[in-house]
Amino acid sequence: MQICWCFREPGTKYLAGYKPLTELLTEFYDDGRKIAAICAAPSVFSGLGFLKGRRATAYPSFMDVIERDGAMTSTDSVVVDGNVTTSRGLGTAVDFALSIITQLEGKEKAQEIAESVVYRA
């Protein structure tokens, strides 16, 4: 996982317009590196075209934004489609983190961490 962040408005608006970040995201996406965003941040991915034709999710008030940009929206807590992981918000943050850990370190490591924080799915 190369980039992972969570911002809400107006932060995502500023991030979407910050050229060094969008260039880096595009480089990572084009190289097939794993990228992840939660809450409103998936709208930055969709604005860059990363979610077009992909399953994705976001904070409820941003679902229309990512759908308008071509995402196939889902209300799942976490959606992994290829190298892109998206999640809905604070209430799904543990699921999001465990998904990323699973992708990077495997299911056993994610289970170990879930147990260490007394997480119950």
Segments (PLM) and residue ranges:
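Active-site-adjacent pocket-lining segments in enzyme domains
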Residues: 1-121
